[in-house]
Each structure stands twice: as C-alpha cells, then as structure tokens.
Amino acid sequence: LRQSNNDMEVLLVERSSNSAFGDLYVFPGGKVDSEDDFSDKLSSHSDLNDVDCSKLLDVEGGGASFWVACIRECFEEVGVLLARNKDGSMIDLNNKDKDRFVDYRERLISNKISFLEICERENLFFETTNIVPFSHWITPDIETKRFDTRFFAAEMPKDQPTLHDGNELTNSLWITPKEAIKKAWNGEIKMILPTSKNLEQTFDFNSTNELISFYKDKRSSEIKSILPKFKKVDGKWEGRLPGDEGYE
C-alpha cells in the first residue's frame, strides 16, 4: 500500500498466461519456502519473535516465516525490499544501492543466492512493524488445487521503485481499490473473488496508516478464515461466503 495525495493505492500485478492464475490481476506473493525459516538468524535481522507471530496467526510454530516470505516474495516479484540498513538508514533503490540490489534480485530469482545470504551480506533489518496480517482465504473443496492463503498488508517504503519480474508477471500498476474494482466490473482487468473482496475490505479506511494501525495487533481469531462454498442450483454452480444465506 502507499499513500498518494488523499488516496490510498494498492499494487496489483498481472500474472503471465503461462503461470498459475494466468492473466489475472493479483497481489504480489507466493508460498512460504523452507528457507524462510531463519530460526537462529532471525533476531539478527528483525524484531520478529516466532512465538508472537505464531500467536497472531494462531499456528503452533513457524509464524515468523510468513513475514519473511512476504518480504522475500515482494523483492523477487516487484523489486520492493521491505527492509532497512541495520543502522536505521533507508535503502535507496532509486540511486546509490540500485545496481547492487538489482544484481541480488536477479541471482535470487535464478536460485544463485538465498535470501538469507543477501540479508547477511547487507546486514539488513526487516520493516516488520509495517507488515500486518489482513485476511485468510482457503480454496473451496470443489477445486483440485487448493491453497491456504494468508494475505498481509504492507506499507510501501520510500526511495524504491516497483518493477515486475517480466516472467511470471507481465504488468503492474498502482491503483486505488475502488478504481480497481471498477475496472474489473468493466472487464478491463480480470481478478478472482479473494482479490476483489480484499480490495473491498480496504474501503472503510482513509489512509494507509489508518489501515496498518487497525490490523497491527489483531490475532488470527479476529481475522476469520474465509472458505467459499459452492452448490449447484438449477444446474449451475453458485458461490456462498460465510454470512451469506445458504452458506451452511
């Protein structure tokens, strides 16, 4: 998320037609990898505590790896690094730090370096205070490929451009949530239900700071899991969300 004048904008990316969710506009992201569990190295790069993160997500352990995955995926997919130098100074990906981190990103995408190696070499400290759990969606059981997806909201750092990777992602845009929904309704962009519902969930907030502050200390129990259900009505599949009539 970023603040643009009086409007809050969200970053959407278009998936390649050759990838999962091809041609759809989605949020940057991906799966949690085993390398996202920094374990003994975590305190060197973050104020995250795995116990607290796990409580926030209502999981038994490994909660901090979700935040690490969020940071890593944003860097891989759109070149945004949600981190500072350990001395507190901002990383300038527009100018002085640009070439070095462009090289890191290319090597990370091609599996020639790990994200932990980058963090160790550059002595990075994650901007975790501005990354908050936002929603939790589970793929309905009628699908053969199912996902258990945690969505996070993160504030865009200053002095960083966004650049989609050009492989899995073919386009990216900053747009207000309401304008994105309008474009989807008009058929200008394609998106699936979790994306549109997450966008609608931002409508009650006037600024990025307001939204981040609201979700900062919410536990998973306050962020209800959303499992869409589908039933055939007159030979056609109809979807229901929790709270809709006929959901149970």
Question: Where do the language-model regions lie?
Answer:
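N-terminal leader/linker segments that precede catalytic domains of diphosphate-processing enzymes
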Residues: 1-248
